[in-house]
Amino acid sequence: MKIMISQVGRELYKVPLRILDHRVFVNGEIEAFLENFEVRRNDSEVEKLFQVTETVGSLKYDLSRCSATGRGSGAENLAQLDTEVSHLLDGVNALLAKAKVERTASTQLQEARLAREQRRAEFLTNLEHGYRRIENSFEEKEEEIAELYSDLQLKLNIAK
């Protein structure tokens, strides 16, 4: 009988932990948010920039090869195209360098982040207080049950 009561007590102790443990869900939501709004967007933008860089680089290589083999007025046009493609490649590289510059968060975003941190801290404090209340209540109930059980043993004259 005492073993069953302690098992019930242990199970009751685990209930608030199971009910209030939302870490897995919250972590999943945070990861999904980051995936949707940062990773995908940045990856696609960077990928497009690298594709443009590849295309411009291959055009520059092909133009320099064609200008080396070309003769006459065609060679002049190819030389002009070669310089224009070089300027275009420099512009793309400058754009890539500018895209890599880290942006600072706006004040509104920083304030919202701070407010979320404060709400989280308050929630954790309240949660800890709730846990302590449950633990104290559980300990009191355990003591009451132990007293009742020992009184019952005395009344029934059962040896321990």
Curated annotation (Swiss-Prot):
Q: Assembly and interactions? A: Component of the biogenesis of lysosome-related organelles complex-1 (BLOC-1) composed of Blos1, Blos2, Blos3, Blos4, Dysb, Muted, Pldn and Snapin.
Q: Which gene encodes it?
A: Muted
Name of the featured protein: Biogenesis of lysosome-related organelles complex 1 subunit 5
The record's comment on protein family reads: Belongs to the BLOC1S5 family.
GO cellular component terms, semicolon-separated: BLOC-1 complex; transport vesicle
Q: Which PANTHER family match?
A: BIOGENESIS OF LYSOSOME-RELATED ORGANELLES COMPLEX 1 SUBUNIT 5 (PTHR31784:SF2)
Organism of derivation: Drosophila melanogaster
Its function, per the record, reads: Component of the biogenesis of lysosome-related organelles complex-1 (BLOC-1) involved in pigment granule biogenesis.
